[in-house]
Amino acid sequence: MGVPAFFRWLTKKYPATVVNANEDRQRGVDGRRVPVDCTQPNPNFQEFDNLYLDMNGIIHPCTHPEDRPAPKNEDEMFALIFEYIDRIFSIVRPRRLLYMAIDGVAPRAKMNQQRSRRFRASKEMAEKAASIEEQRRRLIAEGIAVPQKKKDEEEAHFDSNCITPGTPFMARLADALRYYIHDRVTNDPAWANIEIILSDANVPGEGEHKIMDYIRKQRGNPAHDPNTVHCLCGADADLIMLGIATHEANFNIIREEFVPNQPRACELCGQYGHELKECRGAENDTDLGDEYCKPEQREKNFIFLRIPVLREYLEKEMAMPNLPFQFNLERALDDWVFLCFFVGNDFLPHLPSLEIREGAIDRLIKLYKEMVYEMKGYLTKDGIPELDRVEMIMRGLGKVEDEIFKRRQQDEERFKENQKNKKARMQQYGRGRGGRGRGRGQPAYVPSHGILAPMSAPMHHSGESTRQMASDARQAAMQFNATNDANAQAAANLKALLNVKGEQSPAEVAAQESRKRKAEQPIIITDEDEEPKDDIRLYESGWKERYYRAKFDVGSDDVDFRHRVAWAYVEGLCWVLRYYYQGCSSWDWYFPYHYAPFASDFETVGEFKPDFTRPTKPFNPLEQLMSVFPAASKQHLPVEWQKLMTEDESPIIDLYPADFRIDLNGKKYAWQGVALLPFVDEQRLLETLKSVYPTLTDEEKYRNTRGPNRIFIGRNHKSFAFFQQVAESKSNDLVDLDPSLLNGVSGKISYDSTATAPGLPFPSPVSHEECQDLPTNCGICVLYEDPEYPANYVFPAVRLDGAKEAEKTLRPEDWNERRDGRFNPTIGFNRNAPRGGLDLSGQRHINHHVRGAMYDRQGGNDNYRGGYRGGYQGGYDDRRGGRGGGGYRGGYNDSRPDFGRNYAGREGGGPQHYHEHQPGGGHGRPHDQQPYQDNRRGGGYHRGGRGNGPTGYQRPPYRGGRGRGGGGYQGNSSWR
């Protein structure tokens, strides 16, 4: 979804929504991998009924990974996809249904974004290749050896644009997935009693929306279990909105944990530690090896995002006192989803005044809560917005647009000044007090070679957070590399240290080094990241005139045009909301502009009446390829169709520009800009394609058809006999399913002429050691259709009768410990899940090592963070003069109630005892671990005496307060 930073913003504001996924790892026995037994209870102490896979989020990282070497061939890609699905399956362990959805042909509104992405990717690839070749020629001209081009790698280059419906790759992937399902149904007991639905690329619709359509249509059937536990796998931000829009009682999202700032290898030499423009061209050093600077490859972890917990947060956030109408949480949540669309989505550009990094969603929610008394009702109902109320919200936002733009400019100027100052500090810091090649802070009298060459020193911590220190270190390293060739020098230093007993002496090394060394460069603050020229200047008067003149080539005094743009935008909002709540209302609608209007232009949208009653249908797969592909990806199309992209005589050659302009639109990087591509003229395209349709082969015709969903079960499933009867009938007539035999699944099935019958061998289409032929197929496959509803049916956006609310995670605002007892927060999915803990000896061990190291790094009494011996030690040793922080683990205090998380279950376990002493006193009393309390100044889990010790345990994104210790309830902690 087009909301950059949305997931980061949401999880930072609502931290308890995220739970780390526990998983059982595969074991190796005698060199063979032993698969995880997924019939065992779920390691996350939560049993899931249905698992949905948004397959494109799996296909892309498996076919062209960014954190490991690329697969050698297509078969290896398929094997990696199977392995990825196995891993997700072993974490979630669905007990009823597995639904695999691959992106099919998308609506026109989405196709415009797909077109922009693919053309932009093609342009960036060409520019990168040109940059690599230019750097190669420059290094060769300087007499520097460069790695030779590897012909086999060039020929095997994988074009990720082939992950689009209608390509041969997607057809082969569908065949491979059918084999994979039959293999697992035959050999894995955990698959024996579940249903598997495969919606491949020939089924129209985006993967996540095919999943939502399935859930909506199952909810409308009386046989649906309202307490079904859902889990959807995918990384798109819009999955969060879709999860809320289902109104299901227990909906969860599983995704890879995002690790920012991952190192990438140089495109020319393949080594780490520098960028292309800093490459010196040499092959991997034969002595040190690439492993010297290559980062450790770690398997990515998975996290769950719990929609029920997000609902708890939003219930508190959307609470409004003294409403003139009855509060309805489900309607309020739908309004929250709708307001998020203004910040960005895949179908509309975001409003110029709304940037998520500037708190746009918070601003909209605040405005909504202020104006709801004037609106006297909600913004939406069942996915249909009330446009007169939308106009009121936009009118309120339009009044503060001037202020937003001016504040944005002030913030940007302040940020640029801070970055400039930081760069100056980093340059000075990178040089240290010595000369070229010395480590940070290395004394000038220490030689940078030979046996006295220093190894890396321990990191010196300041009072800044770990994240800030990491950022500083990265920038220091980058600047040091750019000015002093730090990586090459560090390698030379290490080789000098290792070669002391070798052929060269330290003196010889020093002599060689002096001959190689270039003139030392002065510290220069360059504006290498110079900001693009801003001709709009939204922060100055006349901004609207300049904006419309530059972006639309009209004057702002053309009120009718501004209203047309605003009406088209509102029509898009109506389309998007229906898409999320009712399904695709029009396959051919799209927003016909590259830029959004201003909020102050929504003056008359209350009068607008959108109409989506005209029947439409999706493109065929090959027609979509012609709509979204650049000419550089033409190899995935039939030969005669390719010519329409490249030949000058083609009637549609203008749709495939070799180059195009990217408007940065106030941004810094090209990927953030707007690709100014011509919109596809649907009628002209389809009319032109009629001339090449007769040239299609049978295989190409099959790839160009709209296909059905397929449902699979195993021989041990209780519906196997019924499915076999349908398959043996070889009839195309649809037969109703019995939900009681399929875990509540409703719909219709019919014979699949392409399926392999049970009992027959199933040859593997994948040439890989992990993908062997099946001697006897034990699965059965038939075609599947969702339940049907009338054309004008409206799916109600409500909580179903009989749905049980998930167990609360956040502490109620009216909780009183004296009255209600100690609050036991939910850690993970289950409040009663076993928790790890430490005995007293373990606590002492941690205190001794961690606190001791903290004291050493922070400088003891002189550091602003703490007293002589803070925390646990300071608690019982106050007589020695230090005013220690209270408990072993300090906590945090959220100034906004109920946004806190209790991490006691992960590290601390049950009640922990220690001795609390008053300053100067020699006596003490045992004190139990106390829960987090938001109504006290200190956020500590443990109550202790007053003190100035370290704030205790810190967990991002929270930082203990500076100054007095956060361990005790009288210490100060802060939300960061």
Swiss-Prot record:
Protein name as annotated: 5'-3' exoribonuclease 2 homolog
The family this protein is said to belong to: Belongs to the 5'-3' exonuclease family. XRN2/RAT1 subfamily.
Protein species of origin: Caenorhabditis briggsae
Enzyme class: hydrolase
GO molecular function: 5'-3' exonuclease activity; 5'-3' RNA exonuclease activity; RNA binding; zinc ion binding
A single BP term in Gene Ontology: miRNA catabolic process
GO cellular component terms, A-Z: nucleolus; nucleus
Principal location class: nucleus
Gene for this chain: xrn-2
